[in-house]
From Swiss-Prot:
This is Hexose transporter 2. Belongs to the major facilitator superfamily. Sugar transporter (TC 2.A.1.1) family. GO terms for cellular component: plasma membrane. Residues 16-32 have a biased composition (Polar residues). Probable glucose transporter. The gene is KHT2. Pfam families: Sugar_tr. It is found in: Membrane. One of its GO terms (molecular function) is D-glucose transmembrane transporter activity.
Amino acid sequence: MSELETGTAAHGTPVENKSVSSSQASTPTNVGSRDDLKVDDDNHSVDAIELPKKPRSAYITVSILCLMVAFGGFVFGWDTGTISGFVNQTDFIRRFGQEKADGSHYLSNVRTGLIVSIFNIGCAIGGIILSKLGDMYGRRIGLMIVVLIYVVGIIIQIASIDKWYQYFIGRIISGLGVGGISVLSPMLISETAPKHIRGTLVSFYQLMITFGIFLGYCTNYGTKTYSNSVQWRVPLGLCFAWAIFMITGMLFVPESPRFLVEKDRIDEAKRSIAKSNKVSYEDPAVQAEVDLICAGVEAERLAGSASIKELFSTKTKVFQRLIMGMLIQSFQQLTGNNYFFYYGTTIFNSVGMDDSFETSIVLGIVNFASTFVAIYVVDKFGRRKCLLWGAAAMTACMVVFASVGVTRLWPDGANHPETASKGAGNCMIVFACFYIFCFATSWAPIAYVVVAESYPLRVKAKCMAIATASNWIWGFLNGFFTPFITSAIHFYYGYVFMGCLVAMFFYVFFFVPETKGLTLEEVQEMWEEGVLPWKSSSWVPSSRRNAGYDVDALQHDEKPWYKAML
């Protein structure tokens, strides 16, 4: 959403409003930056009416509401944190594993990979199919429905006695629900949040993922001493509480004003905007915001209903944005974060930490705590800078981690872990934790932010679903094949992710524009104007430009690519 940062008194209240719609507003002459627009009296310029920017303390209510929506991330994180422990618990292995000749039980790599990773396939399918509920019934009702589907999957898992394929089916169904959540939660937040804290509020989704992972680890640690199905049924049973909390929260969350405008529910859209921005329903800036949304929706209506074919259109640059979203979400998985969580147990064992549950808790704490940093930096420094910094820092960490593992950890080879170097192990632990910090403060939350901000309303649900599905598919491939790969090449696997991280850095620099401080409609305008991504941070929307603004300079660059990077 937009904000009023100009024509205000010292305390952020409007001084004068001279127009009621964005189409009637004149433009400022000072375009020093997107978020610092001033009235220039010498040139008699007046800013467009925008929703006022208030102190962050004024947005406590909307932050809590968005946190309720973001709780969908907790549901996903809880599954990630608990399933990693289930496959190591004795009762789970006895019920769903295979029996050896001596009567003991085990889970093969194939069965483990299927049980853990099939959830991601369910998420990919659910993200594509169930996200349509958001367009049909609204984002809030859509979220309630997919949470109920998730609960059905949990019931099937809890009811499983000793048939692994029953548990397998339950995970597919719960994955369908989580896939729908992963699309609708960031979508609702991005369409409801005030624009100057939108990145922060969308990042709540990742914060809830890490919180769910951490609490899942702690719950596994608490139930590991039991010898019966309490080990895994109690953590699954708690999912009912999470579902009830989220459905109840949706009763208090305002519906997306963009969805409401699309359904011609204008008064409700105005109330939603007023509630999210903590302003009066009668505030002219609310009407101006609705006018801006109406203009965008009307333009999309004139173009006709969106089809799958339109996703591949290059005229509106939807296809370019779809590819960008798919690659951003794929790269998030290819950072290697799951590799660290999988292989972390081996590293920690090398320095005497034999309890894999303790290992998980340590990594979970770093992951969760670091996400608070991301909530601050995403709107402070912008999306591009955070993604570029994250890719560069993770590359450095991965080089050290893999190199020490290959050359120093096991001096007598991987077949003799008993001779592991404690110093090398300590070094790798430090860089593993620093790597997780870098991931949690950059690619973990900001991938969702970029995808949620990049698409026009008419194709948003479809594009977000496809982009998010690419994340789930790579999650499945990573989860299924990592045990086989690490057992074959050990720490050399880190160099594969290092190559992906280098590719990520260059891709972001050349193809991902900055969207910090822009409304979703202004993001659409920037794409249509063909602004070069590395110049996008200097771009100003047409409603805020002066007569001397040169948009052509942002569409071309005479400098070689390596100078542009510098």
